[in-house]
Amino acid sequence: MPPMHLLERNKYASALPALKKVSINNLFARSVIENHVRGRVFVDDIARPRAFYVVHPYGMSLLYGDIKDGFLKSELRDYLLGKNGLRETGEFLQVFPSNLEEKIDALLGRSLGTVEENGKPPDPSRPVIKHKRINFRFVPKKYARARKDLNLKAHDFKRIDENMFSNISGSVVPKKFWDGASDFRQKGIGFSLLKNGRIAASSFSSFVHDNMLELGMETEPEFRRKGFASIITAK
């Protein structure tokens, strides 16, 4: 089986021109390629890479470029299936262009499961589950109207410092999107909503590129369903 090749960090720039042609949300992949966070980049050929598989440490991945059947049938297939120790943790994979979807469906065959629209859980015996990612459009005017109704002055906020960076618990937290606290303080920003001196919810920039950013948000379990997510993201 042909191998996938792990690209060295000092060669990540070779993955950027093809990424600029990707029209779906790709800031997480760009963060890896531009060395904002330590991830991995697999390619079809080290000397002249055309196909790229970028893995963000949070577990998001993007397959893009000139994807030939040979690359799909390389170690990439075993990687997707979690075989031979090539992938040890779960990933959320997106592909571009969209016609790759049919090729991957055929590649994985009976190993591919789907999320049932009736709410039934997917078949646990399937190593790969096909799902959908929904992206929302930000409408500044609607946001401004909603923000006025939140009365932010009634709440206690604190900008995320180095100590908080390390101690905020949960799944979507700054330490899973940035290499370190100092890096986050220099290039990102985030706030926590405090209740009785305790962190109830946090919102932060998970990726920042040019004039774009993506927000990450986490609420502590005991403070959920109280509207704190809307409040902290508005801050």
Predicted segment positions?
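Acyl-donor-binding surface of acyltransferase catalytic domains
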Residues: 38-40, 45-164
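Conserved acetyl-CoA-binding loop-helix of GNAT-fold acetyltransferases
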Residues: 70-80, 215, 225-235
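A short helix-loop-beta-strand connector motif used in the catalytic cores of GNAT acetyltransferases and
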Residues: 33-49, 182-191, 213
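Intrinsically disordered, low-complexity, positively charged segments
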Residues: 19-39
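Exposed alpha-helical structural elements
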Residues: 10-14, 27-28, 71-76, 99, ...
